[in-house]
Amino acid sequence: MILERVEIVGFRGINRLSLMLEQNNVLIGENAWGKSSLLDALTLLLSPESDLYHFERDDFWFPPGDINGREHHLHIILTFRESLPGRHRVRRYRPLEACWTPCTDGYHRIFYRLEGESAEDGSVMTLRSFLDKDGHPIDVEDINDQARHLVRLMPVLRLRDARFMRRIRNGTVPNVPNVEVTARQLDFLARELSSHPQNLSDGQIRQGLSAMVQLLEHYFSEQGAGQARYRLMRRRASNEQRSWRYLDIINRMIDRPGGRSYRVILLGLFATLLQAKGTLRLDKDARPLLLIEDPETRLHPIMLSVAWHLLNLLPLQRIATTNSGELLSLTPVEHVCRLVRESSRVAAWRLGPSGLSTEDSRRISFHIRFNRPSSLFARCWLLVEGETETWVINELARQCGHHFDAEGIKVIEFAQSGLKPLVKFARRMGIEWHVLVDGDEAGKKYAATVRSLLNNDREAEREHLTALPALDMEHFMYRQGFSDVFHRMAQIPENVPMNLRKIISKAIHRSSKPDLAIEVAMEAGRRGVDSVPTLLKKMFSRVLWLARGRAD
């Protein structure tokens, strides 16, 4: 069973959100998208540590800066879906038999709704119900009992949770570590792995597993948290760097075909570590939903890679939040979800499992995920043909006083990956985009591609396309008053009669395209803003307008 959708209306910092989830989810967004409110909602409503949650006055949304405009109603709908058609009949789901709803796609789902009503006297009422596929309440004998069973089966575990940290620091975590069970499980996993040694000795396997425990502990306790914190690690590995390398090899052993039994052992180890920390007891049928907040915290990129691989081996649904381009480079783009706060809602953008063709997905993975993962955080992409434009545009924008990084604008060359996959991807992910093309034959084809994507809408074309009235950026800048730079770089006097193309070719030959582009941009800087071509100034204004949400 997985949590398939979360719908929130009027809870804390979220006015309205509809978020589709899959087995693996990495959420990104700017600071104000409502991360804490979403994670709090899941943590409070599906917490295995306490009884069913009752809404409070502070849970109701209010417009920013207007606390007196606080809403009096909120509701949250959690949609759970069986992992495969027919799985709802297995033993552990039988107590929820009355709550399952058959749907047209062949799957059964549970629609669990929670509502909060705030009265004038400050009192708050919490209502629970299970819905059918049309949104009507199902007549269930004991709703609270069913809700408790649902939470027992799919509790939320919030890694690096601040409330848990505070309990550790306050010394209120029960000091009942189950060290012996953990040691036995580690020994068993070590024995299992040593039967397929992959060139690792028993000692190396144990060092790697020691690093595994250390890593899992990293997410449940804070360094130097005082005496109340009981470490399962008896001692640090003598060579920590080597231990991490062994853990990486163990990860790969577990990840290969036939490694399912190892994953089950790993899950048992994970559960034991949780219980050894004294935080909670999980039901034997529980399949927790992991909430992982910013897993890059205090981890070197190499260790983050090993850690992320280990977390991905746990056979559990995961929702992670991150601000790390490094972590995005380790994540298939299909798992990434961008959340953007709009005036009336928080919009969720993701490709989903059938978002791009195999070929387009491969190109995006190489061009964006591996080489420019931080561009997924951008508000707007300015797509240019090649390296020359990248240098010139970034530098000329800076000369005009525009700081693209601070505005969330990324200049990305598209010649290598193709224009259409990038535009399709940007649209699906809610990233604004604008294309700058040359005036040659290739540029005209790119412009035609943009027009076809915009259904030949002239208004939309003005927002998304700028075409240079010259063969390329070099010819354009030559004609815009920078001919002396080209002559200087080509070492040709200005009064020598020579074909324009030859002058540019010699200038490139005696330096390089990027060097020539930088020299032109630097010359523009010396001359001042007035020397920047009007066409490019207009394009900068348009791109800034797109990045700012078309607000100005």
Swiss-Prot record:
The reply on keyword ATP-binding is yes
**Which positions fall inside the Toprim domain?**
379-469
* Gene Ontology biological-process entries: DNA synthesis involved in DNA repair; double-strand break repair
Q: Which domain of life is it from?
A: Bacteria
Q: Which SUPFAM superfamilies match?
A: P-loop containing nucleoside triphosphate hydrolases (SSF52540)
Q: Does the keyword tRNA processing apply?
A: no
List the molecular function annotations (GO) for this entry: ATP binding
Positions bound to ATP? G29, E30, N31, A32, W33, G34, K35, S36
Coiled-coil intervals in this record?
none
Give the record's keywords alphabetically.
Answer: ATP-binding, Nucleotide-binding
PANTHER family assigned to the protein according to its UniProt record, in alphabetical order: DNA REPLICATION AND REPAIR PROTEIN RECF, HOMOLOGY WITH RECF PROTEIN
Quote the protein name from its UniProt record: Uncharacterized protein YbjD
